[in-house]
Design a protein with these regions (language model features):
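N-terminal pre-triad scaffold of radical SAM enzymes
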Residues: 15, 22-83, 93, 109-122
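Short, small-residue-rich loop/turn micro-motifs
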Residues: 71-73, 192-194, 264-266
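Short linear Ser/Thr-Pro motifs
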Residues: 6-8, 68-69, 155
Length: 325
């Protein structure tokens, strides 16, 4: 792969690479931001990058990477700008690792880190490229850096993949890999976004995905222990899109096997064209906290992931490819 362009943000960089057959592929490297108390409020609402810089965690403490797994994406999610890019198939294991190598080569000053969280879903649905994605995760140990890798498998969990696997097959393979290879230190995140299955299907552009009920039943009844990292259900919070905490509890959401992540809807071209509006972001963060507290009443671990106001443009998947292609 060759370098095409880059976009700089206060906390890191978005890179646009190009495959040998000329397809644009995004990857990113970011530092995490402190989210404690008053600092969190200050960072969240600022348009001054200097304030962001003051609150960045060190590379030695935590580093955030993402790589793409497909040339575009087979799905047409209504909030994601990758949907507008023509789909050209899976990236090979080598092409995925070339992105990792590029990110490391671009940051030679980062030689060790207690946690390198690397997401395999910048562009593409990794469930459709499972063999190459897991192969790339396995090969992370070959890079000559003192890193504690924490790979992240982010998926909408299609009912049937293009490789012929069922959604349950994908869950089993990823969880077994998580436990056998990474001793539990792999983060499995499943995009949910609503507890209304019809609304979920609409948001995923008509994709046939496993229902939340099926996911909860499968994970709750998984025969082997799920250690170190529980399975995370991701919800992008949007106005008019229901997230029924009581319904999730009725399904048997088990705090020993599940966590929840609440994410504001980012400002994308697709979300604007489809009239999707975030329920909460940096300007009314208390609404996000109110939803979080409903989960916490049931002892469900909850993470809120809100970006700063000055970082919104250019951060989302597919946006750099649209600008320069």
């Amino acid at each position: 792969m060759k370098f095409k362009n880059s976009f700089y943000l206060p906390s890191g960089r978005v890179f646009l690479l190009e495959t040998d057959d000329g397809y644009p592929v995004e990857c990113t490297e970011m530092r995490d931001v402190s989210v404690q108390g008053k600092q969190h409020y200050e960072v969240r609402n600022t348009q001054d990058p200097h304030i962001i810089w003051k609150h960045l965690k060190s590379y030695e403490e935590k580093w955030l990477l993402t790589v793409s797994t497909q040339k575009g994406c087979v799905h047409n999610c209504k909030f994601c700008d990758v949907a507008d890019l023509k789909f050209k198939g899976n990236l090979s294991k080598s092409e995925i690792l070339q992105q990792v190598n590029f990110l490391l080569s671009s940051t030679p000053y980062v030689q060790e880190s207690a946690k390198v969280k690397i997401g395999f879903a910048r562009m593409g649905e990794p469930a459709h490229n499972l063999k190459n994605v897991l192969g790339a995760m396995f090969s992370l140990f070959e890079f000559d850096r003192k890193f504690n890798w924490l790979p992240c498998f982010n998926t909408i969990l299609p009912r049937k993949t293009t490789e012929g696997l069922s959604g349950e097959d994908v869950l089993k393979k990823v969880i077994d890999f998580k436990e056998d290879v990474y001793k539990g230190f792999l983060h499995l995140q499943i995009s949910c976004n609503s507890t209304d299955e019809q609304k979920r299907k609409e948001l995923f552009g008509g994709a046939d995905v496993l229902s939340i009920k099926e996911i909860v039943n499968y994970i709750n009844n998984y025969s082997s222990p799920i250690t170190q990292r529980t399975v995370t259900l991701n919800f992008i919070v949007m106005k008019g899109v229901p997230i029924d905490v009581d319904y999730l509890m009725e399904l048997g959401l088990n705090p020993e096997r599940f966590a929840v992540k609440l994410i504001p809807l980012n400002n994308t071209v697709q979300s604007q064209e489809n009239n999707l509006v975030t329920l909460a972001n940096y300007s009314n963060y208390e609404d996000l906290e109110a939803l979080r507290d409903k989960f916490k009443q049931h002892k469900i671990p909850v993470v809120i992931d809100a970006i700063a106001k000055c970082e919104e443009a250019g951060l989302c998947c597919g946006q750099l490819a649209h600008i320069f292609v």
